[in-house]
Amino acid sequence: MALEKLGKALNSALRKLARSSTVDEALIREVVRDIQRALIQSDVNVRLVLQLTKRIQERALNEKPPAGVSPREHVIKIVYEELTKLLGKEAVPLEIREKPTILLTVGIQGSGKTTTIAKLARHLQKRGYKVGLVCTDTWRPGAYYQLKQLVEPYNIEVFGDPGEKDAIKLAREGVEYFKDKGVDVIIVDTAGRHKEESGLIEEMKQISEAIKPHEVILVIDGTIGQQAYHQALAFKEATPIGSIIVTKLDGSAKGGGALSAVAATGAPIKFIGVGEKIDDLEPFDPKRFVSRLLGLGDIQGLLEKIEELQKEQEFKEEDVEKFLRGKFNLKDMYAQLEAMQKMGPLKQILQMIPGLGYSLPDEAVRVGEEKLRRYRIIMDSMTEEELENPDIINYSRIKRIARGSGTSTREVRELLAQYNQMRKMFKNLDKRKLAKMAKKFNFGGLGI
């Protein structure tokens, strides 16, 4: 998860409140000190930290909780509200209004810009937009091929010419090419060869003049911490139509510093990079982000992931009928495991469920993910007949499946036991409830 170390430290501070029988001044001061320490270790600017914790302490000591809210709950709410303000208060979504909408992306060398552009293209494609990418990076020889390789599996086209040295010419031609193709969104990638803001902004102005983008997006490396302030400020002052993506938040100890520094400039953060996979780009919503960070969950985010799966996997009425008759086989179970993996890492999903964020040890989550992966390998070694009718799987078949999948007979038996448990559960479910759940969660994919 993005800022996991910071999240665990903040969650630990709030647990002191939960475990205490009374909330007094001494406890509030102790919790505030813990929050200060956690934020400073995440490279948040000391002045910002002191301002934030002063507000938390003053409010916690002076405000009376509303009727029906315990002092403990009220302090947690104050921490949540103040952290949300630190990271920008409200979400600012990316708007696609015109066809085509032209997005120009810029970033300092090593910011992860090319990978982020591929992620953004995939994000928009999943929301129904036809996207075209224009590579104007004439500086780095492999840039065009890297971008092409990242998006080719998703049928997203890249316009570029590794032999052309004129970036502005490439930008103009690429935009015209995709306009003729009738795409919804054109994303223009720039060189990213600059090591400081001044060169970057000069290039941005030149290409902006040539293609007139609807929005300019600055990609900032989250590992630089509070140094992000200067980049974001220079960028904000140079363009009135700018927004920001902060990358590499999954493994950075300084991510909190980067996010808070950018938010302090007033420049809108629209996305954050939370992993290496192409789907690891999230729209940034301070409220939901802080909720997950504190271990309070993100139900809305979980529902959105489920809806994405529903769009990707066509819902069929006969699938529901099959479940209603108890006709659940290993093929259906395989589809469910596939869908779970599409939702993202198990740890990321658990952090969206209130109370589960930091309660499971990392080792338990890792074992769970590994088990799901091995179940799929085992099913890949089964015949079509065995997947359709698991009841025919006897001991000699179990031995063959274990041999073919490089697993043990114990693991194959464990998978079959899990399958039988799920089948039994479906048979015992109330038929009307099952129909309702099937329509809500799409049994062709995620299931329940």
UniProtKB/Swiss-Prot annotation:
GO terms for biological process: SRP-dependent cotranslational protein targeting to membrane. Its EC number is 3.6.5.4. It is found in: Cytoplasm. It is an enzyme of class 3 (hydrolase). It comes from the Archaea. It catalyses: GTP + H2O = GDP + phosphate + H(+). Its main location: cytoplasm. GTP binds at residues 107-114, 189-193, 247-250. PROSITE patterns: SRP54. One of its GO terms (cellular component) is signal recognition particle. GO terms for molecular function: 7S RNA binding; ATP hydrolysis activity; GTP binding; GTPase activity. Transmembrane segments: none annotated. Keywords: Cytoplasm, GTP-binding, Hydrolase, Nucleotide-binding, Ribonucleoprotein, RNA-binding, Signal recognition particle. Involved in targeting and insertion of nascent membrane proteins into the cytoplasmic membrane. Binds to the hydrophobic signal sequence of the ribosome-nascent chain (RNC) as it emerges from the ribosomes. The SRP-RNC complex is then targeted to the cytoplasmic membrane where it interacts with the SRP receptor FtsY. Composed of three domains: the N-terminal N domain, which is responsible for interactions with the ribosome, the central G domain, which binds GTP, and the C-terminal M domain, which binds the RNA and the signal sequence of the RNC. Part of the signal recognition particle protein translocation system, which is composed of SRP and FtsY. Archaeal SRP consists of a 7S RNA molecule of 300 nucleotides and two protein subunits: SRP54 and SRP19. Belongs to the GTP-binding SRP family. SRP54 subfamily. This is Signal recognition particle 54 kDa protein. It comes from Thermococcus gammatolerans (strain DSM 15229 / JCM 11827 / EJ3).
